[in-house]
Amino acid sequence: MNPVIALVGRPNVGKSTLFNRLTRTRDALVADFPGLTRDRKYGNGVLGDKTYTVIDTGGISGNEEGLDAAMAEQSLLAIDEADIVLFMVDGRTGLNVADEAIANHLRVNQKKTWLVVNKTDGLEEHSAMAEFWRLGLGDPRPIAAAHGRNVTSLIDEVLAPFPPREANAAPPDLSNGIRIGVIGRPNVGKSTLVNRLLGEDRVVVYDEAGTTRDAIEIPFERRGKPYVLVDTAGVRRRKNVSEAAEKFSIIKTLEAIKACNVAIMVLDARSGLVEQDLHLLDYVLSSGRALVLAVNKWDGLEQEAKDKMRAAIKRRLGFADYAEMHFISALHGTAVGDLYPSITRAFDSANSHWSTNRLTTILQDAVSEHQPPLIHGRRIKLRMAHQGGSNPPIIVVHGNQTGSLPEAYKRYLTNTFRKVLKVRGTPLRFEFRSGKNPYDSNPDASDREKAKQRELGRTREARKNRR
């Protein structure tokens, strides 16, 4: 099993910078003010023949109230999970009361702890470390996480007691299993839903919009099946986005939508649908992600309010009618378990593969049932269909004059293929291509000449394949 390293310290000492250095990613937000990392964030790293897992935590200041207290609790939970704690302090600002409070907790916890003095670049190391000796946590280790100085040698020593990679179990692979993106505008209950799905308080839940600033990736198993949950920062209306970190978080949210296999879009039944919900759903659709809708805070609503919400969804979310919908209470767990079958169906549909013969048969049956219209006195012909990709599924239809095919007929084909193939929870995209026969532009070409040209083309293709 991978050794687990927890990065602990007061806010803005460089924990997220070191996390990014150790995992070689930019998965943790990094900016020059405290409080950016509010939840436990997990990443994997490799050094030589050793693998490890790193937990980035929110800062502990020692006088937490409200949200800060929830962040501090997440840090303490990370300490319990870890094999090793890297207690980070700031060599530039020096020792303070919060550092001493954290050190007291670590001594009581008796977890293997390394005292790491960060931001020592440009400082005389002995002077920078001198006052931290009195914390009683052993030799302080100077590093500069932003530039990588002394980081490799530190981790090499930290991992020395642990066996090499061959003797470890395979490290948890964050790409293994269905990646579920939990998305929505701020304070609709995303983090509460994540915690309910996981069965533990892994993500900070607090009644303040925007408490999840990072996209938190959490691998887990349910009934022997692997998943990765991605809890994203809520997307706010653009005019409400002011702080640099908030803007960065929205970018992370949109990146998480692209990276997930299935997006659970959380809607707030109490506040109803707003424009930001529609914009975010439109982004999911344009990204081609499979989608499950979760209408949260459904419990306790009056029947009139429920009917009003259902009507609004039917009227305004017609463009996402491919998604299965559930009315849930993340806080109480009502109907949350029903999300998993929908997630699986959406994932399976998004990654389905069908033979050219089957797709062409469906196309021909659809054309027989309802022919394309005449364009300038000539009937649009649709000859064959094959699959052009997956996640989302793409069906390529060949014929003539396909550029003139009306949108209404394209919708008819989409609905027909979706019904016959039983595609649920994912967009189904079509590409229409017209024939490229060089004789098509020559009205005087005989059928024999056209057949001869086609045979010549097949011969060339066969020779090319033999090479």
UniProtKB/Swiss-Prot annotation:
Family annotation (Pfam families): KH_dom-like, MMR_HSR1
Binding positions for GTP 2 per the UniProt entry: 184-191, 231-235, 296-299
Span of domain KH-like: 352-436
Positions of the UniProt region annotated as Disordered: 431-467
GO biological-process terms attached to the record: ribosome biogenesis
Keywords: GTP-binding, Nucleotide-binding, Repeat, Ribosome biogenesis
CDD domains xref list: EngA1, EngA2
Ranges where the EngA-type G domain occurs: 3-166, 178-351
SMART domains (UniProt xref): AAA (SM00382)
Stretches with biased composition (Basic and acidic residues): 445-467
Binding-site list for GTP 1: 9-16, 56-60, 118-121
GO terms, molecular function: ATP hydrolysis activity; GTP binding; ribosome binding
Task performed by this protein: GTPase that plays an essential role in the late steps of ribosome biogenesis.
Family matches, as PANTHER family: GTPASE DER
Subunit structure: Associates with the 50S ribosomal subunit.
Sequence similarity: Belongs to the TRAFAC class TrmE-Era-EngA-EngB-Septin-like GTPase superfamily. EngA (Der) GTPase family.
Name used for this protein in its record: GTPase Der
Organism: Chromohalobacter salexigens (strain ATCC BAA-138 / DSM 3043 / CIP 106854 / NCIMB 13768 / 1H11)
Gene encoding the protein: der
